Amino acid sequence: MMKSLYAVNLVLLLLLAFFAPAPATRELNMRAAPSDSTRVVDYATTERLLRAHSSDKEEQKEEEERAISINFSSLEKIFKKVTSAKTTELQGMLKADEALGSAFKTLKLGTMRIGKDGSVDPKMVAKFLSSRNFKIWSQHAVKINKDDPYGEMLKALTNVFGEKNVAMMILVGNLSRNSRDVAKKLEKAQFYKWYFVDKYKTADEVFTNVLKADRNRIHGYGREKEIWGDYAKYVTTTVMKY
């Protein structure tokens, strides 16, 4: 009986010894737990730092954008003041009742070129018709002749550049967005003059008498042919209207 109890106790002791964790293992497990916790803390800290850094960058970007906006606004105000001052200066050069031809010279529009090498240049014309000086001149035309300002402008331009060059100038002026509006109004005044004043009832008459081109060789001309075509449409519309 005693031997049996001794054997049972021995087996139990052996089982406990086998399944119980070793001291070194328990120590390693205890050390591992703080390591996991530390990693969580480190991750949270890093995340906070990243958020703070990102927030700082966003604030810096917003400050830069505000600075750019303020600078642009300031420059825009300065530009408007300078432009306004220049416009006022040019307007002050004109007399209230100054003739349009005289005003053309006063505003130094005659010094601005509209062509080179004997040909009207589209870029030069666009610059001329959209210039501040020309705009002030056209405003003056409205003041002194409210009934037909563009007719008066056409007459003054013809006296300076000649009728054919003015026709070419109007044609190429329609090609630019900056000068198209005034070019269309001058074109209307020009076609009206040709039809009702000069009595050119056909586009062929304009082609020969104004543009000084040979009708038999019409396809050899570029701009002249375009003016011919535009005036032909105007004549057709006018005949249908009246």
Swiss-Prot record:
Primary site of residence: secreted
Compartments in which it is found: Secreted; Host cell membrane
UniProt motif (RxLR-dEER) ranges: 48-66
Upregulation: Expression is induced during host plant infection.
Leader sequence residues: 1-24
Free-text note on domains in this protein's UniProt record: The RxLR-dEER motif acts to carry the protein into the host cell cytoplasm through binding to cell surface phosphatidylinositol-3-phosphate.
Protein name as it appears in the record: RxLR effector protein PexRD15
Species name: Phytophthora infestans (strain T30-4)
Phylogenetic lineage: Eukaryota, Sar, Stramenopiles, Oomycota, Peronosporales
Gene name of the encoded protein: PexRD15
